[in-house]
Amino acid sequence: LKAEEKKKQLEEFIRRFSANVAKSKQTTSRKKMLERLNVEEIRPSSRKYPGIIFTMEREPGNQILEVENLKAVDADGTVLFDHVNFNIEKGQKVVFLSRNPKAMTALFEIINGNRKADAGTYNWGITITTAYLPLDNTDFFNTDKNLVDWLSQYGPGNEVAMKGFLGRMLFKQEEVEKKVNVLSGGEKMRCMIARMQLQNANCLILDTPTNHLDLESIQAFNNNLVGFKGNILFSSHDHEFINTVADRIIELTPKGTIDKLMTYDDYIHDEQIKEQKAGMY
């Protein structure tokens, strides 16, 4: 890698993660690298990009998801959202926002059948198959299976195929025998993404998918979602990720939704929307 490219990579990392507390150590160390960046010091980057490719087995029909008058209340009685109505159109990639991040998790759990709504209904189209990436994946890893056996539960394919999948997600040959309950947060996330790829769903539900991922994984994930032909319903803290993937924004509030077909940048700078929001929380 030429010094220029390396410099660009470091700047991209710092720009993307300077506000992210979990990544602050990495950001600081990359700022230092940037400061002492001399051409002689640059060695080719050994960072690899995982092969993330989502494919749909079935073309979706026109009825994707219809939500009517949905309400969710937190365990402590806080209303997370109420009067939520929307209809997802074919091919839309929708980011859900709220001042309370628990609102998005509650919505995704409800439409995935893992939580009961406090009011209202939702209805999936008959051609829709979903793959869900939950915020908390702890329950998936309470087992002493190794990576190959763990992944084999979620899709057809022999051991060689599973090892190939794990290899694409950057697990080395000797790592696939590792027990899944000792994996790091980033490794678990890569396993969950591999699991989702096996499902060949035409609608992806992603609750804060960039948590625990490094820059290379986020970029690979990001690029594949941009080209994905199905529907995506997601939440994220990553500005760039939202801006490049979402073509519709639905904000969940205790007094209904704000629902706009626009980019995230336009949404957060729109004065009318700011005024509308002020009265909804």
Which ranges hold each PLM region?
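Flexible nucleotide-interacting loop at or near the entrance of a catalytic core
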Residues: 1-82
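ABC ATP-binding cassette signature C-motif
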Residues: 1, 57-281
